A protein has these predicted regions:
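Conserved helicase ATPase core of P-loop NTP-dependent helicases/translocases
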Residues: 322-326, 335, 341-378
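Walker A/P-loop
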Residues: 30-51
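Conserved helicase/translocase motor-coupling segment
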Residues: 242-346
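A conserved SF2-helicase RecA2
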Residues: 405-472
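Conserved P-loop NTPase motor "coupling/switch" region that bridges the ATPase
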Residues: 128, 145-244, 422-423
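Conserved RecA-like helicase motor core of SF1/SF2 enzymes
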Residues: 379-412, 416, 420
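Conserved Walker A/P-loop ATP-binding site and its immediately adjacent core
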Residues: 45-77, 166-171, 328-331
Length: 472
């Protein structure tokens, strides 16, 4: 977001005005849309709204995660008034914007929803559509992907916003109209995108989309970056925080968590059970495929580390900081909250168990300095940075208690506190002397080099799988 000149009024920064002008230039050139790919924390919401406000169309549709709705409302309220008629809807409710031609003969709710997503038509048309966190529609066969693409196809201009557009080139098919000039419509767009992938000789674009394949390589990444952001016919704009004058670079650090004797024994037993479930003991050499086993191992390991993470967080709090803790599991969130509140700290939680209103109230309390710690499970669309609100001027740190096996998710998490020109050191916690130490080293190395372009996410997961296979 931008700085506040007075309560409720935002003053855009130069880089946000630059993004606004780039979007408007695409509109003037009669392009079908624009990809705003700035990294998290650079204020994409205000940049997009500035552009939308300057357009002549009055009816605007904004599609975003549920957690981002308060941010959009606040941005619109804190900007100069317009006569725009704005509809804001979260991804899960986009199906309500379509209607079937006739009555469905399907029996189950899921089947009816699938039919609606595939064959439904928009109840009305919005000339300007904004899709925030657009990577959510990268699967063209998903219900949200089908619905959002129809709404975008019916629009005159669509702004796609995402710091992490896709894991691999073929997941960028939702940008087909921008990249190929294809006629609007799911089939025409997919056909044109398939042809483009073949012309660029990127991966295997044959048959059904889910069967498309790609081996990560630098040549393809560079070619796709040129198409997206760098060439004369680039369809979007992407900047990193360090490229903005005066903005701090992301600082990452490893935070080893020491386990006590009982914790070590419990962790080792959990690790042995995990490998046994995957068939990695007793001479078996098959590749790990047990998603459920992996989830159980990570959940148990997460709980085992809670005491150590709480000790580390308390050190940061004792130094006068506020701390945001990213976790993957509700049980871990509850355990950390119990430990830290039991030590006298003011703790709040943001997760799926609470309503959007309750989560926003918790976020605001943290931003005003009324909470010392906030523990969150979401990976996107919330602002937890220093200086957003009065009373929230303490230095911030972000502790990633649960390492995600996705560079895209981790980059989204990093932008919760390190944003809007405010620095927050990001600590990646791991159990010292365990396989987590090697995984953490892989992740932090990859994140340091990641440009957010296609391929990094899948390559990171492959590296982690190899680490699990090779660990003793």
């Amino acid at each position: 977001m931008a700085s506040e000149a007075r309560p409720g009024v935002f003053v855009p920064r130069p880089h946000q005005l630059e993004a606004c002008e780039a979007i408007l230039a695409a509109r003037r050139a009669d392009r079908p849309g624009f990809l705003l790919g700035d990294l998290t924390g650079l204020g994409k919401t205000l940049s997009a709204w500035l552009a939308v406000s300057a357009m002549s169309e009055d009816d605007i549709l904004i599609i975003c995660p549920k957690g981002a709705i308060p941010q959009w409302r606040r941005t619109i309220a804190g900007s100069p008034q317009t006569k725009k008629h704005v509809t804001i809807v979260n991804f899960e409710r986009t199906k309500s914007l379509l209607a079937l031609n006739g009555t469905s003969a399907r029996r189950s709710t899921r089947a009816k929803n699938n039919e609606l997503a595939r064959t439904g038509v928009p109840k009305r048309r919005w000339p300007i559509v904004v899709i925030d966190e657009a990577h959510r529609i990268r699967n063209p066969a998903s219900q949200q992907g089908l619905v959002c693409r129809q709404l975008a196809a019916a629009a005159d201009f669509t702004i796609y916003m995402s710091a992490t557009a896709g894991q691999s080139p073929h997941e960028l098919s939702y940008l087909s109209r921008l990249m190929t000039g294809a006629p609007a419509g799911p089939k025409a767009e997919m056909d044109a995108f398939r042809t483009l992938m073949k012309e660029m000789r990127i991966g295997r674009a044959k048959g059904r989309w889910k069967n498309w394949g790609w081996e990560p390589n630098e040549a393809d990444r560079s070619a796709m970056a040129e198409r997206l952001y760098k060439g004369t016919a680039a369809i979007g704009l992407r900047r990193r925080p360090e490229e903005i004058a005066g903005w701090p670079q992301v600082q990452r650090a490893l935070a080893p968590i020491a386990l006590d004797a009982s914790g070590v024994r419990l962790y080792e037993a959990t690790w042995r059970e995990f490998r046994r479930e995957l068939g990695l003991l007793g001479g078996s050499t098959r590749r790990p495929v047990g998603w459920a086993a992996d989830l159980r191992f990570r959940q148990k390991a997460s709980l085992i580390r809670c005491e150590g993470t709480a000790d580390f967080v308390c050190d940061l709090l004792d130094n006068g900081q506020q701390v945001a803790i990213s976790v993957a599991f509700l049980e871990t969130s509850a355990r950390l909250a119990d430990i830290l509140s039991g030590r006298g700290w003011r703790v709040g939680a943001i997760n799926g168990e609470s309503s959007g209103e309750v989560n926003e109230a918790t976020r605001v309390a943290f931003q005003r300095g009324e909470l010392d710690v906030v523990i969150f499970t979401v990976t996107e669309s919330i602002s937890l940075h220093r200086g957003e609100m009065a009373g929230g001027d303490r230095e911030r740190s972000l502790v990633v208690h649960d390492m995600r096996h996705s560079a895209i998710q981790l980059q989204q998490i990093e932008g919760r506190c390190h944003r809007d020109g405010q620095r927050a050191v990001i600590y990646f916690a791991f159990a010292e002397g365990t396989v987590e130490e090697r995984v953490a080293q892989i992740v932090i190395t990859r994140m340091s080099a990641m440009d957010g372009l296609a391929g990094d996410d899948t390559a990171l997961l492959d590296d982690i799988v190899r680490t699990f296979e090779e660990a003793n």
